[in-house]
């Protein structure tokens, strides 16, 4: 796996680690739940279960490319490549699903979730494309 693909996979993992931090560690801060997620403070108790679980989902998802890169550099290149590809593919599909939920305006005004969907999908797609060469 070339260096560009590895760097892009690491970026994809970092995006998901950032999401974990926002959703689990910092979610109760108004700048996060109101500023990033557009959730009013009054709705915080109703959304805390969601943010906690989705945050850990993102943490576990970030572990895929990280573990894949570790395997790649510790004598298990084939397993590492496949784990990076699978994890990035999963992230790409999750980003597409997030984009669809934005188009359908499932929880916020249409278009307000576009940035999150792109942040989730683009680095993983770029890593997959780079890994093909």
Name each model feature, range by range.
Residues 2-26:
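N-terminal signal-anchor transmembrane alpha helix
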Residues 67-122:
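Transmembrane helix-loop-helix
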Residues 123-127:
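Hydrophobic cores of alpha-helical transmembrane segments in multi-pass inner/ER membrane proteins
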Residues 128-133:
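Juxtamembrane boundary at the C-terminal end of a transmembrane helix
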Residues 25-47:
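Cytosolic, membrane-interface loops and tails of multi-pass inner-membrane proteins
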Residues 42-61:
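Interfacial helix-start motif at the membrane-water boundary
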């Amino acid at each position: 796996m070339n260096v560009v693909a590895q760097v892009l996979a690491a970026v994809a993992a970092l995006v998901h680690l950032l999401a974990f931090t926002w959703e689990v560690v910092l979610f109760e801060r108004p700048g996060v739940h109101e500023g990033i997620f557009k959730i009013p403070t009054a709705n915080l108790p109703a959304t805390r279960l969601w943010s906690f679980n989705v945050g850990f989902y993102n943490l576990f998802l970030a572990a895929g490319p990280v573990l894949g890169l570790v395997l790649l550099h510790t004598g298990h290149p084939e397993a590492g490549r496949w784990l990076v590809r699978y994890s990035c593919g999963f992230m790409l599909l999750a980003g597409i699903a997030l984009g669809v939920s934005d188009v359908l305006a499932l929880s916020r005004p249409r278009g307000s979730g576009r940035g999150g969907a792109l942040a989730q999908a683009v680095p993983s797609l770029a890593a997959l494309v780079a890994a093909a060469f």
